[in-house]
């Protein structure tokens, strides 16, 4: 078992530059060398002292299993971080890491993503092409869901948010406990009369509208959608 007692929490940066817990499902800790991230799927009030949404443990476990599953199944993609180890008993996933996510680059005053990673848009487009070629959507696409590896390769974390085309419709009640108010409209617009979320529709809303308004502040993803999915 890997000892993470001296590993630091990772916090994303919000668009206003303030640090904030990166997600509701796992507690991210980074080793002193900043080369490995442990995603500990647990309810950790110390990491989220102000959080009002408490995700049920069974839902946390469900997403843990999906994260492991897709880290393995998509390991052939260059955007998938290397999976080092999985502690199934304690629900810990150890993956490749490199200091920070793109939220630090985007929302730290004086830093510029286009300058630091000139080809990030091309890499992002390549990522979406690979999702289409491999028949899945990834719906967690905030800046804190991406980092740049030591060799300059775009990597994406939070693979619990991978939806294979064959799982296009998922019953909303299964994941209701993770739906926050800021993004609830996407779920509302994508839920059919039988209570199933259409993730094809959800993905389109996310990539053409939500990301621009809520995080990235640009039209890059909407442009990529037009190029990749409407060819």
Task: Give, region by region, the residue ranges found by the protein language model.
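Juxta-kinase regulatory segment immediately upstream of eukaryotic protein kinase catalytic domains
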Residues: 1-20
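ATP-binding glycine-rich loop module of kinase domains
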Residues: 10-12, 21-70
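Conserved hydrophobic "DFG−1" position in protein kinase catalytic cores
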Residues: 28, 95-97, 147-149
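Conserved structural core of kinase catalytic domains
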Residues: 60, 79-118
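Structural motif at the C-terminus of the N-lobe alphaC helix and the adjacent alphaC-beta4 loop
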Residues: 69-78
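Conserved alphaE helix
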Residues: 115-127
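Catalytic-loop of the protein kinase fold
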Residues: 132-148
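C-lobe/activation-segment region of protein kinase-like
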Residues: 149-231
């Amino acid at each position: 078992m890997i000892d993470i007692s001296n590993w630091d929490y990772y916090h994303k940066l919000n668009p206003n530059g303030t640090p904030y817990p990166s997600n509701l499902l796992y507690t991210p800790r980074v080793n002193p060398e900043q080369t490995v991230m442990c995603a500990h799927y647990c309810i950790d009030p110390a990491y989220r002292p102000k959080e009002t949404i408490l995700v049920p443990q069974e839902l946390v476990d469900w997403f843990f299993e999906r994260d492991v599953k897709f880290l393995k199944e998509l390991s052939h993609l260059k955007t998938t971080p290397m999976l080092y180890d999985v502690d199934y008993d304690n629900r810990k996933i150890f993956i490749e890491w490199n200091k920070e996510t793109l939220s630090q680059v985007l929302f730290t005053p004086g830093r510029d993503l286009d300058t630091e990673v000139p080809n990030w848009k091309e890499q992002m487009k390549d990522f979406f092409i690979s999702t289409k070629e491999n028949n899945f959507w990834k719906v967690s696409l905030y800046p804190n869901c991406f980092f740049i590896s030591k060799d300059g390769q775009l990597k994406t974390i939070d693979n619990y948010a991978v939806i294979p085309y064959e799982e296009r419709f998922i019953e909303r009640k299964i994941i209701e406990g993770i739906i926050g108010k800021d993004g609830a409209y996407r779920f509302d617009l994508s839920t059919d009369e039988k209570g199933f979320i259409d993730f094809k529709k959800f993905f389109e809303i996310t990539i053409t509208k939500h990301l621009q308004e809520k995080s990235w502040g640009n039209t890059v993803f909407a442009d990529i959608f037009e190029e990749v999915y409407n060819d």
